[in-house]
């Protein structure tokens, strides 16, 4: 038996890709191209560039465009490349969206405006204006724990009426609200919290925008594929296998440990930019244990000692 799901407009397994930096904090475009290639070769059919895990608050508009172009050049013919363009300023978000479209992005990730905590009418206007500004499909990003404002279910239903608002990255953790919206719209839901991927699939989601997928993309894809073909027991077994990294990557800010995991795997990532700080030796040691518990074996020699 197969499980029937709505279409997945951006793919099934997307990684919220880190932005690689050199040891002195400069943008590492060669590293970004290598990392994007690795991700697509290892189970990802989509990438999100300049999202939260991409440290978008600390990259300039020009850096975002250069990064996007480098990733598109590397894998744009093999994977969906989604540009994170969300800010807390509608005009700035529109500018970033238009630059991303011109650069060749396949879609846009637009986070709820943060800090200013707009009312639902403000969210409606913001997302509609951004969606009107380009011809690209839009994935809304609902993460009230970071932004301070949730997209209420009724607002989500109204936003779904826009022809270019086609998906949601759901990091709200409210399964009742997600179920309510899924029952009333054609929006494609993507889990924005790795540990909730399988539960969200069970209520109609189509995939994940993940962080552990930097090194566990193949296994995450296998979990989703098992569920889609009706092998719920197989999907559950993979979910349980991956739980150590689904939770372990988030003992501190996800990008900090994502970059530590990339170092452990010998992959490009480099340091984080301030005000974030790199993982401590203790955090890296625990992360290595988590990765090993989830089945990862390809640790780079001496990776714990390397920085950048």
UniProtKB/Swiss-Prot annotation:
Pyruvate binds at residues 53, 209. Gene3D superfamilies: Aldolase class I (3.20.20.70). InterPro entries: Aldolase_TIM, DapA, DapA-like, Schiff_base-form_aldolases_AS, Schiff_base-form_aldolases_CS. One of its GO terms (cellular component) is cytosol. Pfam families: DHDPS. The keyword Hydrolase does not apply. GO terms for molecular function: 4-hydroxy-tetrahydrodipicolinate synthase activity. Disulfide bonds: none annotated. It is found in: Cytoplasm. The record marks 52, 115 as: Part of a proton relay during catalysis. Pathway: Amino-acid biosynthesis; L-lysine biosynthesis via DAP pathway; (S)-tetrahydrodipicolinate from L-aspartate: step 3/4. SUPFAM superfamilies: Aldolase. One of its GO terms (biological process) is diaminopimelate biosynthetic process. Keywords: Amino-acid biosynthesis, Cytoplasm, Diaminopimelate biosynthesis, Lyase, Lysine biosynthesis, Schiff base. It catalyses: L-aspartate 4-semialdehyde + pyruvate = (2S,4S)-4-hydroxy-2,3,4,5-tetrahydrodipicolinate + H2O + H(+). Coiled coil: none annotated. CDD domains: DHDPS. Homotetramer; dimer of dimers. Belongs to the DapA family. Catalyzes the condensation of (S)-aspartate-beta-semialdehyde [(S)-ASA] and pyruvate to 4-hydroxy-tetrahydrodipicolinate (HTPA). PANTHER family: 4-HYDROXY-2-OXOGLUTARATE ALDOLASE, MITOCHONDRIAL, DIHYDRODIPICOLINATE SYNTHASE. This is 4-hydroxy-tetrahydrodipicolinate synthase. It comes from Acidothermus cellulolyticus (strain ATCC 43068 / DSM 8971 / 11B).
């Amino acid at each position: 038996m197969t499980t029937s799901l709505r279409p997945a407009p951006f793919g099934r397994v997307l990684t919220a890709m880190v932005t690689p930096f050199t040891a002195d904090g400069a943008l590492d475009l060669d590293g970004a191209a290598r990392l994007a290639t690795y991700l697509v070769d290892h189970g990802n059919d989509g990438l999100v560039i300049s999202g939260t895990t991409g440290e978008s608050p600390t990259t300039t508009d020009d850096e975002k465009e250069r990064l996007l172009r480098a990733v598109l050049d590397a894998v744009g013919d093999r994977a969906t490349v989604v540009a994170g363009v969300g800010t807390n300023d509608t005009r700035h978000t529109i500018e970033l969206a238009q630059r991303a479209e011109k650069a060749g992005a396949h879609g846009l990730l637009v986070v709820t405006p943060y800090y200013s905590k707009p009312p639902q009418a403000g969210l409606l206007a913001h997302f509609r204006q951004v969606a009107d500004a380009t011809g690209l499909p839009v994935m809304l990003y609902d993460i009230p724990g970071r932004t301070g404002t949730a997209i209420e279910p009724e607002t989500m239903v109204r936003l779904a009426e826009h022809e270019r608002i086609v998906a949601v990255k759901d990091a709200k953790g409210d399964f009742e609200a997600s179920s309510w919206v899924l029952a009333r719209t054609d929006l494609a839901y993507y889990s924005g919290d790795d540990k909730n991927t399988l539960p969200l699939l069970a209520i109609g989601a189509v995939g994940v925008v993940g962080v552990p997928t930097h090194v566990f993309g193949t296994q995450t894809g296998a979990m989703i594929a098992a569920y889609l073909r009706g092998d719920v027991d197989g999907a559950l077994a993979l979910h349980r296998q991956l739980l150590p990294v689904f939770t372990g990557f988030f003992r501190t800010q996800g990008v900090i440990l994502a970059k530590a995991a990339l170092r452990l795997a010998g992959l490009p990532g480099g340091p984080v930019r301030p005000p974030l700080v790199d993982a401590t030796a203790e955090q890296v040691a625990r992360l290595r244990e988590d990765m090993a518990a989830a089945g990862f074996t390809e640790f780079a020699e001496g990776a714990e000692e390397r920085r950048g």
